[in-house]
Every structure is written in C-alpha cells, then in structure tokens.
Amino acid sequence: MVSSCCGSVCSDQGCGLETCCRPSCCQTTCCRTTCCRPSCCVSSCCRPQCCQSVCCQPTCCRPSCCPSCCQTTCCRTTCCRPSCCVSSCCRPQCCQSVCCQPTCCRPSCSISSCCRPSCCVSRCCRSQCCQSVCCQPTCCRPSCCISSCCRPSCCESSCCRPCCCRPCCCLRPVCGRVSCHTTCYRPTCVISTCPRPLCCASSCC
C-alpha cells in the first residue's frame, strides 16, 4: 500500500497517510491535510487544505493559501490581501491597494496605490502619499505639503508652506505665532504680529 501510494502515481486510497508524505507523493491527487509538510510544499500541493503554518513556503504562496500563509517567506504579490498585512509582510511587492492597512504603513510601502486614510500614519507620510484622501493631521509634514493636502487639519507649523497658504488654512493659530482670524486676510501680512511671510500668499491675504 505504501509503495503503490508513494510512487509516481498516487491513488486516493492511501495517499493521506503520514508515511506517504514524501516529495514523490506530492501530486495534485495526493494533497491531503496530513501530507502538508515542508517537503510536500510544491506548486501542485498549494491548496487551502495544505496551507498550514509548516507548509508556508514561497512555492506555496498562492491566493488560496492567504491568510494562513502570511509569513515572511510567503509575502508575494499574489498573497497581498488585507488579512495578509502583518508586519512581516510589509514589503514593496505587497503594497497593493487591497493590502494597505495601518500595520503595513512603512516607508518601503509608501507607494501611490497605498495612499489611503487608514495608511496615513506618521511613518508613512511621504510625498507620493500626500493625496487629498490621505490628508490627515498625522501626515502634516513638509514633504506632504502639496496643494491637494491644504486643509485645515494639515495647516500645522511644520506644514506651513506657500503651496499650503489657502484661506482654509488661515482659520486657526497653527500656521504662525498668533491667530489667523483677521490678520491673514489683510495685505499687511508681513508685520510681526501676523503669521510667517511665506504664509502670506496672494490667495491667503
């Protein structure tokens, strides 16, 4: 029984035995739960029932194996799903839009497809992530100060740039030393009691 099962041809009778868990027995018809071992992790055995933690190898990284195979060695583009967004899987090849979670917000993951509000943490604030949907107080940094991010929540002192000098940014005392209620809408923005000169653009005076 063992010899007939662990040969080149696998039958359904005895393929699930632990004694059959050999590389020669890792056929498509022999992929059982009991056969899910590292030596059996070939491409033909990559099925949901074979996606155990011990069988998480790069050759087994397929969509059907995510999320139970979200290990460092199984972080592939095909495995980039929200359930797979653990810290060990935060790599550039896993930074797809469907895999953009707070746990994956790392500098290496800061690509344009990952610019979502859930990914707007301080360590993910880069220029390519400064879109209008990603303009949060935690992302208000000089590198994030582009025109699309000019909102009241992004008008902090560290983000006070000419491109961010808009009327919506002149409503709170965050763009200078004093309040911007009245002095920011006047041509006399260059006096000492008003905000910084670089915040006194024509659109903000």
Curated annotation (Swiss-Prot):
The keyword Repeat applies. Coiled coil: none annotated. Expressed in the hair follicles. InterPro entries: KAP. Sequence repeats lie at residues 20-24, 25-29, 30-34, 35-39, 40-44, 45-49, 50-54, 55-59, 60-64, 65-68, 69-73, 74-78, 79-83, 84-88, 89-93, 94-98, 99-103, 104-108, 114-118, 119-123, 124-128, 129-133, 134-138, 139-143, 144-148, 149-153, 154-158, 159-163, 164-168, 169-173. The gene is KRTAP4-6. Keywords: Keratin, Repeat. GO terms for cellular component: cytosol; keratin filament. In the hair cortex, hair keratin intermediate filaments are embedded in an interfilamentous matrix, consisting of hair keratin-associated proteins (KRTAP), which are essential for the formation of a rigid and resistant hair shaft through their extensive disulfide bond cross-linking with abundant cysteine residues of hair keratins. The matrix proteins include the high-sulfur and high-glycine-tyrosine keratins. It comes from the Eukaryota. Residues 20-173 are annotated as: 30 X 5 AA repeats of C-C-[IRQVEL]-[SPTR]-[STVQRCP]. This is Keratin-associated protein 4-6. Belongs to the KRTAP type 4 family. Pfam families: Keratin_B2_2 (PF13885). Interacts with hair keratins. The keyword Repeat applies.
